[in-house]
UniProtKB/Swiss-Prot annotation:
PROSITE patterns listed in its UniProt record: NATRIURETIC_PEPTIDE (PS00263)
SMART domains attached to this UniProt entry: NAT_PEP
Signal peptide residues on this chain, from the entry's feature table: 1-25
GO molecular-function term, one example from the UniProt record: hormone receptor binding
Family under the similarity heading: Belongs to the natriuretic peptide family.
Disulfide bonds: 94-110
Organism classification: Eukaryota, Metazoa, Chordata, Craniata, Vertebrata
Tissue distribution: Expressed by the venom gland.
Protein name: Natriuretic peptide GNP1
A GO cellular component annotation in the UniProt record: extracellular space
């Protein structure tokens, strides 16, 4: 073998090892750039937690100060919210569908509320 070829090969191998070592991540240095972000997020979460506590206390005080008229409105308001949530939910209460004929699907066991008709209708679409 040619000695120059051996030297060139060993030099390339040595450079490859040095470059690989320089590119390796050091665990102590890797987390340094994220420390300010972690501190900032911890401070933000603590501040939000304190704001949430203040808001919860204010809501409790408002409930304590509410008069008898407010107590009567609460169930009606909850019922209104529940009906709105039901309307916004996808129609997934059926346990199956069947194809009657081409392009006509009927639901089996579906009782869907049709707000236009004002009553529940059997699941034929």
């Amino acid at each position: 073998m040619d000695p120059r070829l051996v030297r060139a090969g060993s030099l390339v191998l040595l450079l490859a090892l040095l470059v690989q070592d320089q590119g390796a991540a050091h665990p102590a240095r890797a987390g340094q750039k994220y420390k300010p972000l972690i501190r900032r997020s911890e401070e933000d979460s603590q501040a939000l937690g304190q704001e949430g506590d203040v808001a919860a206390r204010a809501a409790d005080e408002e409930e304590d100060a509410a008069g008898p008229g407010d107590a009567l409105r609460q169930p009606a308001f909850k019922t209104l919210l529940a009906s709105r949530e039901k309307r916004l939910q996808p129609e997934g209460s059926c346990f199956g569908q069947k194809m009657d004929r081409i392009g006509h699907v009927s639901g089996m066991g579906c009782n869907k509320f049709d707000p236009n008709k004002g009553s529940s209708s059997t699941g034929k679409k």
